[in-house]
């Protein structure tokens, strides 16, 4: 269901997305309609902390959830968005057909980063820095003409490209203690994905993959269906249920808007389902964007926003590409708190993290699984400050972000247990930082803080701050 808004009166009307025949839903008597909810408060923090949508879903349907593990990951992904001519395709031969063409006979284009040597580089980086997994996009046959052709079969999900030595990489990752993350781009052919699903998931289990990122770029097949129609919602649920049967975790992109089903199927670790970080390559997201999403998109479940972008100007890679992210570097650290997800990416290139190792330390340290959350201040479209307690320690983390205006965040430390001394490591915007003119200006300092006191922290235009708070006698 969508909401249509009258631009003059701001009145809202429900809009059920129909199928290609105009039918809004196929139902059998008797039937129950889904819950429809409104979250209303005169304090924006109440909206952020509300669990109403999640709690209206059925309890967990998976008896043994011990295999579901939150994770932090990097990936062969962003380098295809930077404008440096890298591509998902192994060859430029658009007549290649998955399962028919002998790809070993094709001429490689030399611009394919999902190759054995490069993936090993990512695995090494992940192992060195304690990152759990490595996503690899562009590993399988079918990318030569994948966008917009609407074929009955675009991809095969068990056929690696010749330069992607899957058995060698599988064993190398295992040796290094790193998990490879599967990628299933469907080119929006959900019908064919249903047909391949069991074979694809079995292939994953046979090769030590426990998690998959799915994608549905383009117009949906069955033709003229919509991303949020009844058919696609049923498809999405089927994928999650079948994934659970194989003990596979899912991060779905271009998926229907979430409605809290991750409570019932917690293997659905994350979804995109809104304008995410990849749009920093397509003109950039405005600073206010991530001050809105926690009030809207995230009420239905965690979002794979792909934070952690340190090089925000794409002209760094290609002078002809002027796209710039609406963020400072410090704000990217804060997003790990304000845009929480149990499957959280560090999206930038390893070499960019190596340029800023002190800032990258926060990404290495910040958890992805939380025991408690306290929203300290918030206004939609303007600012958010939140504190979260690590599920596996007594450490608290604070994230604060602002829109295109500078402001001073007031961080009330009353959430800290009394009777202890604490130190706060603060990653913040430098005084001259600005998302557009000086995005990489940041500073790091450690100060003593006390429960019940207020910490004032400057946030630059489009900026933010990320803080780790530890007991000084913590081991």
Q: For the regions a protein language model found, what residue spans apply to each?
A:
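Flexible loop/turn segments at secondary-structure boundaries
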Residues: 45-46, 81-84, 126, 141-148, ...
């Amino acid at each position: 269901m969508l909401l249509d808004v009258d631009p003059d009166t701001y009145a809202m009307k429900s809009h059920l997305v129909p199928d290609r025949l105009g039918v809004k839903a196929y139902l059998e008597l008797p039937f129950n309609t889904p819950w429809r909810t409104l979250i209303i408060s005169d304090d924006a923090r109440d909206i952020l902390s509300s669990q109403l949508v999640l709690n209206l879903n059925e309890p967990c349907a998976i008896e043994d959830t011990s295999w579901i593990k939150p994770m932090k990951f990097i990936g062969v992904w962003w380098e295809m968005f930077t404008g440096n001519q890298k591509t998902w395709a192994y060859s430029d031969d658009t007549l290649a057909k998955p399962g028919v063409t002998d790809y070993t006979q094709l001429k490689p284009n030399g611009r394919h980063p999902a190759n054995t040597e490069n993936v090993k580089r990512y695995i090494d980086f992940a192992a060195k820095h304690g990152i759990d997994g490595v996503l690899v996009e562009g590993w399988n046959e079918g990318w030569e003409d994948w966008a917009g052709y609407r074929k009955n079969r675009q991809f095969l999900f068990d056929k690696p490209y010749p330069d992607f030595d899957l058995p060698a990489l599988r064993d190398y990752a295992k040796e290094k203690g790193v998990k490879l993350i599967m990628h299933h781009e469907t080119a929006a052919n959900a019908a064919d994905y249903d047909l391949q699903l069991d074979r694809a998931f079995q292939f994953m289990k046979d090769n030590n993959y426990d998690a998959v990122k799915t994608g549905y770029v383009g117009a949906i097949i069955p033709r003229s269906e919509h991303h949020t129609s009844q058919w696609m919602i049923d498809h999405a649920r089927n994928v999650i249920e079948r994934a659970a049967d194989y003990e596979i975790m899912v991060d779905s992109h271009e998926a229907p808007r979430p409605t809290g089903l991750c409570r019932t199927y917690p293997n659905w670790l994350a979804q995109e389902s809104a304008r995410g970080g990849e749009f920093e390559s397509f003109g950039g997201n405005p600073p206010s964007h991530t001050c809105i999403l926690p009030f809207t998109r995230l009420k239905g479940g965690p979002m794979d926003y792909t934070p952690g972008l340190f090089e925000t100007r794409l002209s760094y890679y290609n002078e002809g590409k002027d796209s710039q992210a609406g963020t400072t570097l410090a704000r990217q650290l804060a997003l790990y708190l304000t845009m929480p997800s149990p499957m959280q990416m560090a999206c930038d290139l390893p070499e960019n993290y190596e340029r800023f190792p002190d800032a990258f330390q926060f990404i290495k340290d910040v958890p992805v699984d939380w025991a408690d959350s306290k929203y300290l201040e918030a206004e939609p479209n303007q600012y958010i400050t939140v504190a979260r307690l690590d599920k596996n320690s007594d450490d608290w983390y604070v994230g604060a972000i602002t829109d295109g205006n500078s402001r001073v965040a007031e961080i009330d430390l009353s959430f800290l247990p009394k009777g202890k001394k604490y130190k706060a490591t603060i990653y913040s915007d430098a005084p001259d930082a600005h998302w557009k003119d000086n995005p990489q200006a940041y500073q790091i300092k450690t100060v003593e803080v006390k429960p019940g006191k207020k910490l004032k922290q400057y946030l630059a235009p489009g900026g933010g701050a990320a803080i780790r708070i530890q007991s000084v006698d913590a081991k």
